[in-house]
Amino acid sequence: MSGAMPVKRLWSRPDLLSIEWADGTLGEFASLWLRDNVREDRDPHSGQRLIDIADLPENPRIRSAAAHNGTVNVEWEAESRSATFELQWLLAQAADRSGRTDSGLRFWLEAAGLDAARDFAWATFAGARSDRTLRARWLDQLWRDGIAFLSDVPCNDAGILEAAALAGRVLETNYGLVYDVRSVAQPENLAYSDLGLGLHTDNPYREPVPGFQVLHALVASPDGGESLFGDGFAMALHLRASFPDDFEVLTRTPVPFLYRSRDAELYAERPLIQLTCSGEVSAVHYNSRSIAPLRLAARDAGPFYGAYRRFAALLRDSRFHLQFSLRNGDLVVFDNQRTLHGRTAFSSAKHPRHLRGCYLTRDSVYSEAALLRREFHPETHS
């Protein structure tokens, strides 16, 4: 296979196939896992499985395994069949199971030393719409960094929806498909005021939590109203390294989040820091404005509030803030379960400020990125 990583050596025993690639990657594949992933046992059109685990031999034993022309052929002892696996596909599986569930992410803890225009992904709206290679790269960087930007998005009603469609599918909420962020009298949400807002994630009271958020600058304020962003994963990992007990408390304590307005009441409970089954940080949910009274035993109040205060202090630390001014027509997309956002205070009486926003479903952003990756790198999806 052209461009495939060469295999340094391959060996097997009845219960295991082992492959070492030229770059040092070692893949170990259980015989039962290989038997479960035989391509011929899937429908060729949908790719869905045609068999169930109960249809497979309980303990398939490998008779032989041999590499040839970018593939490896595996024969089993008790079955009169063999299966061929693409070595590049097996390499991708080996990388995925390396134990690094955060593989491919770039953390940016001390964001104050970064420059939004220099250190993060930017594309023009027209370029991302017309150049699929550019859009694929932009989406990959969005997943890597948890944030990416577009410029020259038309400042009209349709602009944000046309731009959002380049990343994923818009999630309709009680705010509608889009919402306007500008100051109003007696706001039902402090986002619609002149107040500065500390770093937070949006809608932790919603089920599911919106995966990605989009903000489009229609009228930028020349004085105040600067955007703030911080890498919640990086700060959570910093807390874990420095104060592991506090980190553990925040991962296991359910926090109630509540939103009430004239036309909606939303409630959900989730920890401030959420982990995968393997213990890696998978989401940060932080919005002090929306926390309802906690249901804590008295003995648990001290440890939780101590950990909560310490994490809040991290989020307030300006060393961890990426601060800059969006210009008219700029648009930012960010992971609402990783990248916290906020703003500095401003005076709408002196300088009106108007952003338009929407949310994207997490699975649709993943799908857009995966489809483009598959289009330009088919060898990893064979």
Regions found by a protein language model. Give the residues of each.
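Motif-centric detector for short Cys/His coordination patterns
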Residues: 1-131
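Active-site environment of non-heme Fe oxygenases that use a 2-His-1-carboxylate facial triad
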Residues: 102-147, 152, 156-382
